């Protein structure tokens, strides 16, 4: 261990190598608190060259490496399992100037999402992806998981925002792909290879991101419904609006908990809610009102046309994860279902949970336009049984088991519920080509059967 520590310190300096047991335990536990691994050291490199050197040190010694960003993931994607070296990207925090003409900005892997939003706003632009953990989630991790979030219906996932990137491959080679023109058909779209690869194919060190114009007007509405199918149908109608920014599904019980937690005056009392936001160069209030009248919700919607009102409504949505966490670490699902199957899946999943764990409480929220749901099960003692049963239901209803959180280590042995054997074999062939010793993010994505 001392030899490894000294070799790591030769690269980054002794102050940036940590072997304290308490620190390593904290850094080896994921955000949910459900999953803890084991690591032998934490290193915090300053730049791409140091990352390349660190990877060479670890690879040559046969030491696994787990890459960590903001550690906001929910599928144990940064939890080490093999006494790994933890490689943190937190010091890769440089952020470039906004290129107004091209609508782009370059951010280091350790830059937080909030910092990108701030830099874009200062230049009169915006970044299209947003998530509740924006203050701690980092760009490198968001690219590696192809994060989505609150505005995917309009702007897409991280894949749609990446114009170029720099990555250190498992062999220490650095690849920089940063075309300055939008029309570029010269060879493979290499950046796409690392978007969503969850650190298994290399360490993303910086990213060129697309920025957008800020719409002049914004209207936010919280609408109550009696059934989930009503929410789905309302989402279909509202999605036809020009400039729809968000269509968020909220479980009525969760909204009540959020309202109490925030001590906020938001509508409650209905089983289901839809948080809709529209922004455009023209005032969309009249268009939204017309569609709401056509939908005919059972109670008058709350509508906000100013920033404070919008912030109040969004606060209730954004604290959902925090609120459900107050009852202990929930069992979390992140799945996408065809819209036609969303309501029936929810009914079936609720029944399965009730039969496997009668004392458990399911709370649902998500992004209804994409059929992306976050099912949180509170007080669930039979977690393993419930987990597989619900994921099998996802498959049976035509969905996928990982919509935006990634596979991580939590879902690696359920990958066959979403992908064919040939899909997995092709991905594994790419992994083996770039990382033949399988030392980088070894616990992530691929089923145990491939590794034994």
Regions inferred by a protein language model and the residue ranges of each:
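Noncatalytic alpha-helical scaffold of FAD-dependent oxidoreductases
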Residues: 1-452
């Amino acid at each position: 261990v001392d030899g490894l520590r000294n070799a790591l310190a030769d690269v980054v300096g002794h102050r940036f190598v940590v072997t304290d047991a308490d620190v390593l335990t904290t850094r080896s536990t994921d955000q949910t608190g459900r999953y803890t691994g084991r690591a032998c050291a934490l290193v915090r490199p300053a730049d791409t060259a140091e990352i390349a050197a660190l990877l060479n040190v670890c690879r040559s010694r046969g030491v696994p490496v787990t890459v960590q960003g903001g550690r906001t993931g929910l599928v144990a994607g940064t939890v080490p399992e093999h006494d790994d070296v933890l490689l943190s990207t937190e010091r890769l925090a440089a952020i470039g100037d906004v290129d107004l003409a091209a609508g782009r900005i370059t951010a280091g892997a350790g830059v937080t999402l909030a910092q990108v939003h701030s830099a874009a706003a200062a230049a009169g632009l915006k970044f299209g992806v947003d998530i509740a953990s924006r203050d701690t989630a980092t760009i490198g991790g968001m690219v590696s998981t192809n994060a989505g979030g609150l505005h995917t219906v309009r702007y897409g996932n991280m894949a749609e925002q990446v114009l170029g990137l720099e990555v250190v491959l498992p062999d220490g080679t650095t690849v920089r792909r940063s075309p300055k023109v939008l029309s570029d058909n010269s060879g493979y779209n290499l950046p796409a290879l690392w978007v969503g690869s969850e650190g298994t194919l290399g360490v993303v060190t910086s990213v060129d991101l697309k920025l957008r114009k800020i719409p002049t007007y914004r209207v936010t509405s919280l609408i109550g419904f009696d059934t989930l199918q009503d929410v789905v149908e309302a989402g279909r109608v509202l999605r036809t609006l020009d400039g729809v920014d968000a269509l968020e599904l909220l479980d009525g019980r969760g909204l009540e908990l959020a309202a109490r937690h925030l001590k906020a005056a938001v509508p409650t009392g209905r089983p289901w809610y839809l948080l809709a936001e529209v922004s455009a160069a023209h005032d969309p209030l009249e268009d939204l009102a017309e569609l709401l009248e056509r939908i005919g919700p059972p109670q008058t919607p709350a509508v906000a046309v100013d920033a404070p009102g919008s912030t109040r409504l969004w606060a209730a949505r954004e604290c959902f994860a925090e609120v459900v966490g107050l009852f202990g670490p929930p069992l979390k699902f992140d799945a996408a279902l065809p819209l036609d199957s969303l309501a029936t899946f929810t009914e079936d999943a609720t029944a399965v949970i009730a039969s496997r764990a009668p004392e458990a409480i399911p709370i649902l929220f998500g992004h209804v336009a994409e059929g992306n749901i976050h099912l949180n099960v509170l007080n669930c003692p039979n977690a393993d049984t419930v987990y597989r049963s619900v994921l099998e239901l996802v498959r049976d209803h035509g969905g996928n088991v990982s919509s935006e959180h990634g596979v991580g280590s939590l879902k690696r042995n359920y990958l066959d519920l979403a992908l064919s054997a040939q899909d997995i074999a092709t991905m594994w062939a790419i992994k083996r080509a770039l990382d033949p010793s399988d030392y980088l993010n070894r616990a992530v994505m691929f089923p145990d059967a491939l590794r034994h």
